Amino acid sequence: MYYGLDIGGTKIELAVFNEKLEKLYSERVPTPKTDYEEWLNTIVDLVNRADEKFGEVGTVGLGVPGFVNQQTGLAEIANIRVADNKPILCDLSTRLGREVRAENDANCFALSEAWDTENQQYSTVLGLILGTGFGGGFVLNGKVHSGQVGMAGELGHLQLNYHALKLLGWDNAPIYQCGCGNKACLDNYLSGRGFEMLYQDLKGETLSARKIINLFYQSNESAVDFVNLFVELAAISIGNIITAFDPHMIVLGGGLSNFDYLYEALPKALPPHLMRKAKVPPIKKAKHGDSGGVRGAAALFLTK
């Protein structure tokens, strides 16, 4: 059996999958917030209960909102302070008596979609999350590309380029401070949160993303103008990412991935921001939704 765990700030979810990545069982518990030993024991207890239920020792993969530094072995997950800067893989492996693997949750999302039956024809898959934040993961031949340290795929911390700043009005462009310490990171522009902040700054009105999208479908002039600008901003930024990775397929997740107009508009807006001979890859909506994180974490032990 393949166990995937989604490690969040408020809850930890374990799901059990077979070799076809079909979910057989899941359990969710609150995340301990103050005691590291309690945090470790919570994960160990979840795994042990799954072992007992299925009568075998399953593989253990974690999806975390950060990464485990491959050089130091320490977790860098600032929003789960109880486990931040701790050797979580070493400690869990010792307690569980087996190898434990971990990846950024966006990488797990990309891996889950890459392992979908329909998508296994694509040797390179780029997963982009347009949710509370903007991030991504890159899968090559069924495996996550993590990079030297483990930070590959931190696409939300790429910054606005020349064309994006020009689109937003140069000196009048909204420049947002990012939690990483830099300014103008894509995380604050291409996320659902960024979608709302941009609308407020450019249109002078505070609306939810859902309301803006509803107004767009009602042909509201302000919303249509804004959505067209957002699509162009996304095309500029994603075009750079396509140039870097040249993926066979792109899959979108997160709340904004449910905005169906993006799948019509983005492929049309991308070509001017690519090299002349580049191809716009298929852009698809994620199929596995909220299960993508645990499913991708389980797939860390699968190989093509």
UniProtKB/Swiss-Prot annotation:
Pfam families given for it? Answer: ROK
Q: What is its EC number?
A: 2.7.1.59
Q: Say yes or no: keyword Coiled coil present.
A: no
Q: List the catalytic activities from the record.
A: N-acetyl-D-glucosamine + ATP = N-acetyl-D-glucosamine 6-phosphate + ADP + H(+)
* Domain of life (superkingdom): Bacteria
Q: Which residues bind Zn(2+)?
A: H157, C178, C180, C185
Its BP terms in the Gene Ontology are: N-acetylglucosamine metabolic process; peptidoglycan turnover
**Record: residues binding ATP:** 4-11, 133-140
Q: Name one GO molecular function term.
A: zinc ion binding
Family named by the database record: Belongs to the ROK (NagC/XylR) family. NagK subfamily.
Function, in words: Catalyzes the phosphorylation of N-acetyl-D-glucosamine (GlcNAc) derived from cell-wall degradation, yielding GlcNAc-6-P.
What is the designated name of this protein? N-acetyl-D-glucosamine kinase
